[in-house]
Amino acid sequence: MGRFILVNLGLLVVAFSLRGSEACCPCGWSSYDKYCYKVFDKRKNWDDAERFCMEQGKGGHLAALGSLEEGKFVGKLAFKKLKEHPTYVWIGLRAQGQGQQCSSRWSDGSRILYENWHPLQSKKCIALSKWTEYLKWYNHICDFTLPFICKFLAEPDDPE
């Protein structure tokens, strides 16, 4: 009996010490590395999708992808949500200025830390392609209406 109480007390201490270390996302959103993500299958052009994402949460934007691992996580979310549907999904990157040069920043203002362009793609508004399981970046005309992926910084699980 004493051992049972001691084990339960130990588990309780571990549970409380871990509390607050996880990110908390709203219902229907998925968390990865302190951020919340959601794939929306409603179709919007790039600018309207970015505006919509900004309305979803504090600091929300179309998803910026900072690493291959994050790209794989987002790709899996999109593939699961859009299995039998659209072939492209907007992310938070677009060309800026007169030329076809890509912006040096994502729509949330963060720097581009890695790139995963499909070969032969020029750079306009950027979408992920179903044919690459939503892993490779493709340019698309910004006025096309596509599904999109929003991202924002999660609230700590225990804001105290």
Curated annotation (Swiss-Prot):
Cystine connections: 25-36, 53-150, 125-142
Tissue: Expressed by the venom gland.
Cleaved signal peptide residues: 1-23
Domain C-type lectin residue range list: 32-151
Keyword line: Disulfide bond, Hemostasis impairing toxin, Secreted, Signal, Toxin
Domain of life: Eukaryota
Pfam families: Lectin_C
Intracellular or extracellular location(s): Secreted
SUPFAM superfamilies per the UniProt record, alphabetical: C-type lectin-like
Coarse class of the protein's main subcellular location: secreted
A molecular function (GO) term: toxin activity
Matches recorded under InterPro entries: C-type_lectin-like, C-type_lectin-like/link_sf, C-type_lectin/snaclec_domain, CTDL_fold
Gene Ontology CC annotation, any one: extracellular region
The UniProt record lists the keyword Ligase: no
Subunit structure: Heterodimer of subunits A and B; disulfide-linked.
Family: Belongs to the snaclec family.
Role: Interferes with one step of hemostasis (modulation of platelet aggregation, or coagulation cascade, for example).
Name of this chain's protein: Snaclec subunit A
